[in-house]
Amino acid sequence: MASIINTVRATVLSIANKNNYGYITPNDFNLYAKQAQLDIFEDYFYQYNSWIVKQNARVSGSDYADIIKGLVEVIDSFSSTKGLINTGINLFDLPDDYYLIDKINYYPNLTATGTLTFGSIGNTLIDSAANFINGGQVAPGQLIVNTTAGGLYSGGSAFVVSVDSNTQLTISTNNFFTGSFGDTSYAILSTKGVTEIERVSQNKIFYLNSSPLTTPGLSFPAYVLGGANNINTGNTITVYPESIVTAGTVVSQYIRYPKDPNWTYATLAAGEPLFDESASDYQDFELPLSDQVNLINKILQYAGMSIREISLTQFGQAQEQMDDTQQSPNLTS
């Protein structure tokens, strides 16, 4: 698939240069691109709510005109699963990239823990001290979580694809960094007996814990969002009962933010930047191709404000309003 970010940048520069509005540097473009993508991403949820209201009012379409289905597919593409690392007795850090929490599950059945052997590559997990086959508990389909506290990929999850030997597994995704200071600790969890942890308010948890009849237990655990520590405030959860402390057993399913776009380049002898898709920090937009026009319009608006060129901002706004008008149904008919 062709790079969306390069097409968007070329179009933005073409429009901006047509009337001598000024040059947009790669660094400035990346800043505008990040904000534009965030604006559109957050608007998905407002659109979803709006179309649900229209559906209830029987003014939405079906089949190819089912806008809600398309929005759900886009939002679901940002769904992620990640194990939570506990930073206190029952205090767990939420993922850095979470936008909203879908659900948090408790995996009570731990089948194996260990430390990766240096040299694990690709989608393989090698632990020279493990006993995957003879132990008889590890099986394909089980969840494996990176439990390294403070690691580069801490909390990253994957599934066991196959048990290759006593010391080697094939996993669906390599969420471990096996350098000399890499992420090496893991936990393997059975998918049987998984319990959803119910979210409750700070006020409700006080009353639940005040009576032995309502206190959360392992069969009906609960969590409070926004428990604080000396590092993070509002990006943690407190899980009850306090006995749920085993690393990797609390797993979140959430909608993440899109990754920051980054138009990367190599500098030519004349000083002109040349698009370089092979750069290690290259990142395309994560939005669907259908949002390419929206990205262009929003970036033009930000660029116009930056160079104090009101006509460029107005052009982007006018194009965006035109698109919104075409996409909105006429509710008065």
Where does each model-flagged region fall?
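Glycine-enriched, solvent-exposed interface loops adjoining structured elements
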Residues: M1-T113, G150-G151, Q168, Y186-S333
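Autoprocessing Asn-cyclization modules and mimics
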Residues: L110-L189
